[in-house]
Amino acid sequence: MKIIGVGCGPGMLTEQAIKELRRARMVFGSERAIGLARAYLPEGCQIKSIDDYKNLSRLHSDAVILSTGDPMLAGLGYLSGEVIPGISSLQLASARLHIPLSRVSVVVAHGRGHEKGMAETVDEVKRGKIVFLLADPKFNVMELYARLATLTPPIQVALCENLGYPEEKILVKTIQSPPEPSTALYSLFIGNF
């Protein structure tokens, strides 16, 4: 089995990923991931949309599983098999904002991990790190902002929406007047940058 990162948007596939996609016979992925990879899939390749992620480990050894962004950044890299990295939203946002990756701490706040994600974000900002936060649409970003507002300034927040897509938007504000997400596909940089 191969787990291939298809990047966080159009044009973000690596040469290695393209090479592997061109040889694929059976591909599984979300609709978004399939859309990013479709142009490189050979004729006759079986393409299946994933709805149930619980049974992925049981797929045939020839299967290719597509992961948006990079499989090792809140992706499908936990599965057994060869991982082909992709260009992540973290890499793209860091490049756009000129934030060195060595200063970044990644916090994932998906599903039931909202409270833990908020606590980790506050702790990492206190330590002087710049947090890259990946959250799901149900994450209460306004509650996080209220917690961060009690810390000593300066704290900036960069809202990164639809990274890598034509409608990409990055908005940088202070914690006193933070940006509010307007789409489900967003991430945040938080800290002194």
Q: Model-found features: residue ranges?
A:
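Class I S-adenosyl-L-methionine
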Residues: M1-I99, L185-Y186
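A contiguous loop/helix-start segment that scaffolds small-molecule binding in enzyme catalytic cores
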Residues: K2-I3, E15-Q16, Q46, D62-A63, ...
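Short acidic/polar capping segments at secondary-structure boundaries
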Residues: G9, D70, S88, G111-G113, ...
